[in-house]
Amino acid sequence: TASPARTGDTSYLMYGSDQMALNIATVFRCVKLLSESVANLPIQVMRLKGDLFTADNSSRLNYLLNIQPDNNTNAFDFWVQIVQNVLLTGNAYIVPVYNPVTLEADRLALCNSSCVMHDTTYDRYTISDFTNGVYGVFDESEVIHIKGLTLDGKNGLSVLSFARLTSGIAATGDNETLKRFANGGNVRGLITNDTSVRGFGEYQDKQLDKTAVDVDNKFSSGQHIVSLPGQVDFKPISLSSTDMQFLESRKFTVREICRFFGVHPSFVFDDTSNNYKSAEMANVAFLSTTLNPYLRKIETELLRKLIAPSLATKRKFQFDRRGLYACDLDSRVK
């Protein structure tokens, strides 16, 4: 019995999870770049002394934010996971767990986004994350909620929820490239009978269907020359890569994905024409327009949820941005 004929593929990204988008090289690089750029910066717990804010290195929060937030997680992986959650799911939920004796934060539990239900009407979070040992109903003030782009101020949306069409095109392009290399660039087409109306019927239709399956299987097996029986004709219908401007469309999707993430193409190794000065300016623009909003969002949320309102003007959290300005003397002076 002949195997069924192949049909057109639908991009897995249209119906799959957002995490599957990491199979696309540009998405993977953008997510990795943003998450590791945030994690690479130490965050300082600052205390007001006189008229100046100074680092409070003896604070328990300093240890949690820079060394070990949870029992089995280091700070770098912790911040990487937070930014990845924001980019891929739109939300990152952190629950501070306090020591009942000292009343200090004992650990910062990063919850799985799928285990959190946010009731925006009553501003409550229902969490059932037994892996991280966090479950119950929490008030809005008890959960550190880092959001992506939000339309209502309460729930974040992932970048991929807006870039799904472009990402789907990129995924389809990758699949098409794989198929072109896998089958040697075999063509697609129609099996027809050149006798027009004469001789057609149920039996002839079944024979044409069987011929189509046989020809498709022969092309799939790697044959380049296939004989057709009788007056059966094969008419190719697929366009070549040149006709489809296939490579140009793939270049376009790379830059289109970069636009959604706010990442310059040079950071995903797409633009090879940059000189040293333009690369330096791209790095400065990346910090000021792309990375800094994420840093500011995290700093504000930590201050709001970890510091009492009466001390909010005397404490602050601040990422040390000096490392990112290492090559830009003008920005370091400012």
Residue ranges and their predicted role:
Residues 189-190, 253, 298, 332-334:
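A general alpha-helix detector
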Residues 240-243, 283, 331-333:
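Short, surface-exposed amphipathic charged segments that create phosphate/polyanion-binding patches used
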